[in-house]
Amino acid sequence: MNKIFIAFLFSNLSFLQCSYIFEPVIEEVSPVKIFEDAWQVADENYPFFTFKNIDWDVIYQKYYLKAKNTQGDEILIVLHNMLGELKDGHIWFYTNGGKRIKPFYSPRTLKDRKAFSLLVVQKYFDKKLSFAGGKRFFYGILSNNIGYIYISTFKNDRTEWYIDFKNIISRLKNTDGIIIDVRNNEGGSDIVTHYVISFFLQQPIKSPVWVDSQGNKSPEYWINPNKRIKYLKNIVVLQNGTSFSAAEEFVNIMKELPSVTTVGDTTAGGSGAPEDFRIDGGFIIHIPTKALLRYNGEYFENTGISPDI
């Protein structure tokens, strides 16, 4: 397989919004070594083998000869296809040139990615939506005195995130209810997720349990109500198939509150906590090491979380 064919193959995956620009593999490291290192990272850390009924040893046998017979950057296709067997939206790898390759997107994510538009949402408001948190939030009040907050991400890369969200809740405290929209929110940090949830708690709530690849459960953790502001009126959470990762944790916890109703479509189904692992050849494997469970103890990886309505 020559490089022209490889480039053509992956150019047809550009709709996945993933960069498939390949850098030459470091010659001193054999393709088999790169393959085996990547396989071992998953073997030692991935928490969903049993749940997904995947025999990882069989996958090794399936791709070993392919790795052995590769030349140059053909090993990238072997890694792409091997890791793609896990069907996990939290898995990708970086080439030695720093390019990210993501083998899998949830079918619901692909279906719903373009089904949401803030321009359409705006039509329901008399005034233009305000934004805050570096345009992480858009918010306003409907004519029937219902507040609306669109949370585009739970990433914690901006300090004003926390201050701005508190100010938004203060501005909406006299509304008769709030719609919290996490459609097309692809996640971020559970620290941010818990912070947002704290404003809607009457009393502490236990965080869902994380389980690692060995079946060990995370220590018990409680989310406490915000000390300064509490919004305890009715809340509707809007979700869709592109609500992913930390956004799904948000939905998972909010569904436990008596004041909350979730509406929309089943979430993407990405419940892992990923970490980066460096391997020979300059590659970085990004893969989950823990799985978040529902409150009933069930996995929601791939299956997602269904709305109430």
Predicted regions and their residues:
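Gly/Ser/Thr-rich loop/hinge elements
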Residues: 188-236, 242, 272-279, 285, ...
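Cyclophilin-type peptidyl-prolyl cis-trans isomerase
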Residues: 247-264
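Bacterial Sec-dependent N-terminal signal peptides
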Residues: 1-25
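Low-complexity, Gly/Ser/Thr/Pro-rich intrinsically disordered linker/tail segments
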Residues: 306-309
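Anionic group-transfer/hydrolysis microenvironments
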Residues: 152, 183, 242, 266-267, ...
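C-terminal soluble interaction/assembly domains
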Residues: 255, 264, 270-277
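Flexible, low-complexity junctional segments that flank or bridge functional domains
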Residues: 18-178, 182-198, 202-208, 216-220, ...
